Amino acid sequence: MDAKTNDKSAGKCPFTSGRSHRIRDWWPGQLDVQVLHHNSNLSDPMDEDFDYAREFESLDLNAVIKDLTALMTDSQDWWPADFGHYGGLMIRLAWHSAGTYRITDGRGGAGAGQQRFAPLNSWPDNVLLDRGRRLLWPIKQKYGRKISWADLLVLSGNVALESMGFKTFGFAGGRADVWEPEELYWGPEGTWLGDERYSGERQLAEPLAAVQMGLIYVNPEGPNGKPDPIAAATDIRETFFRMAMNDEETVALIAGGHTFGKTHGAGDASLVGPAPESAPIEDQGLGWNSKFGTGKGGDSIGSGLEVTWTQTPTTWDNNFFDTLFKYEWELTKSPAGAYQWQAKDAPAITPDAHDTSKKHVPTMLTTDLSLRFDPAYGKISKHFHENPDQFADAFARAWYKLTHRDMGPRERYLGPLVPKETLIWQDPIPAVDHALVDDKDIAELKAKVLASGLTVPQLVSTAWASASTFRGSDKRGGANGARIRLAPQKDWEVNQPAQLKTVLARLEAIQSEFNGAQTGGKKVSLADLIVLAGCFAVEKAANDVGIDLKVPFTPGRMDASQDQTDVDSFAPLEPRADGFRNYIGSRHQFMTPEEALVDRAQLLNLTGPEMTVLVGGLRVLGANAADSRHGVFTKQPGTLTNDFFANLLTMDTVWQPVAGQDDVYEGRDRKTNAVQWTGTRVDLIFGSHSQLRAFAEVYACTDAKEKFARDFVAAWTKVMNADRFDLHR
């Protein structure tokens, strides 16, 4: 809502500000592996046995809601409430906490309280939201560890809506805080509000969703500040689609959110000070301090826009649509010089936020007019205008989706306000309704799987394909549900559909035979059997080279149906690249292969050593896509050896690019010049990158064969269980 600010929010250039240079300042093209080690327990101030879910479940949520409700109308002199109510501010606070979510990679969102940290706390679009967090601090301080900042930010938005007469759909807790900023890719730009993310005919680069650096969604003045409602609608549609919202949800969210509060552009934006991260130390993390008038209340400057959408900005009603359709609109500028629109030939009927004796002519943003003048949005807006109950329901559901989209499956939701209805975007999976297999059953299934004719590479690659869709960002994907047998996953190129069909058919036959022979309701799900078969294959691969180990397995997965699977919603989970399988798809664009490997490892919540041992193990086990031989640095494929590392690091091999093949290399014997191996950038990075080479050296040592196998099994099990929220919350 408030989006525009000046350049004072930017920090100083690292090369001219007198500080020492980091390694990546000297070698900016160096692969960044440190992203795999962020938010470790070394930065966590909580006790080792701290369990946020347990703490939240002991919270008196009604007491928190009561305190939040009281806060809404307890205007503070240091930051007076607009219209005597902080509701508009708290809605924007919650919205912008959740609104960074993007469906392409599941990153962003409200799930970790990242709005407290740079860069989000100092984004132009988050101007003055630091005031909202400071208003919440006494409540956070009161309830301490029982409610996270992440949960409190979302809850404050819900309570704000409820306190102004709106009935929300529900609220779930369970968002545990993190303690350091995430190093996410927010765009290529080096300046606030830059838009180098576009190419061609306004093609927005992936995985981005927002239109400019430092914005949550779109520029409220219009594309690049040009006040064109139709062009703005194009940006809105693309951006909200990339945040998993359709047209109806988009209209409901914008109109619902703009039913309350106002924007702030009372005067010259050049009088506004720097953002929190570059504010003077004595300002104690409060940014955007203004020298215009009092700098607060009626003198507030945020986005530079000065718009109050309705005549009842602290009440839920249909006034937004009433105003939008009642008047014709003419272009004007705010006192801060930002483009906005005012009602033509309209009386001054909109209240002032801080002076009850003043009234204003109705105003709107360029992006508000998009909801009327874009044909598709206009049709939806008229329907909502004529059917306010349907508008209220649509906004309630869209707000719930916005604020909970990155929480993952419903089983992670905590608290008494979780709605009973299960929604398709929650990727539902049936609850376990049968007795689970025991050790004796597992032994029987192992014998059947190993006698089925399926190979170690087939079983390993199928289990990996099923489990490795998991994204720690929004807790989606994973082996639970066995969605690898359903559209769209069964048809993904990386999953080798023809081979996958064969493997699944044989596993389904084993499942059917086993379940048909049971009494007492015992069953094995296909989801469990896929993982179990992969575990059997890993055990066999280790045993075949004399390493005796057992791969842990815990039953309890269930099989989802096609009706429980939104094909369009699952499409973004398709890997454009998967370095673990040495796969680069035709649509892969925005990263090098080795960057894509680290990116996928980060989504799987893997550390650098875990990523390293998994790549080395999956190569020798033959799990490459399309049965590629790249990176299979072993003479005994299908066995769990440390050959990948030993053969990569030897000085007996010389590597050189293969002519005509992008990112493919051949390793030749240094003496005979005979080709020994072929590999990709993903393979060779473990010998080239100094930190990854250090990890690889550990596993290449002669005495590391068993350690390699044990570490591989541990990392494998972590991925297989990544979505088992019944085992870890």
Curated annotation (Swiss-Prot):
The active site is at residue 96. Binds 1 heme b (iron(II)-protoporphyrin IX) group per dimer. Keywords: Heme, Hydrogen peroxide, Iron, Metal-binding, Oxidoreductase, Peroxidase. Its EC number is 1.11.1.21. One of its GO terms (molecular function) is heme binding. It catalyses: H2O2 + AH2 = A + 2 H2O; 2 H2O2 = O2 + 2 H2O. Pfam families: peroxidase (PF00141). The record marks 92 as: Transition state stabilizer. There is a cross-link at residues 95-217 (Tryptophyl-tyrosyl-methioninium (Trp-Tyr) (with M-243)). Transmembrane segments: none annotated. There is a cross-link at residues 217-243 (Tryptophyl-tyrosyl-methioninium (Tyr-Met) (with W-95)). Formation of the three residue Trp-Tyr-Met cross-link is important for the catalase, but not the peroxidase activity of the enzyme. SUPFAM superfamilies: Heme-dependent peroxidases (SSF48113). GO terms for cellular component: cytosol. Its cofactor is heme b. Heme b binds at residue 258. One of its GO terms (biological process) is hydrogen peroxide catabolic process. It is an enzyme of class 1 (oxidoreductase). Gene3D superfamilies: 1.10.520.10, Peroxidase, domain 2 (1.10.420.10). Bifunctional enzyme with both catalase and broad-spectrum peroxidase activity. NCBIfam families: cat_per_HPI, PRK15061.1. Belongs to the peroxidase family. Peroxidase/catalase subfamily. Homodimer or homotetramer. This is Catalase-peroxidase.
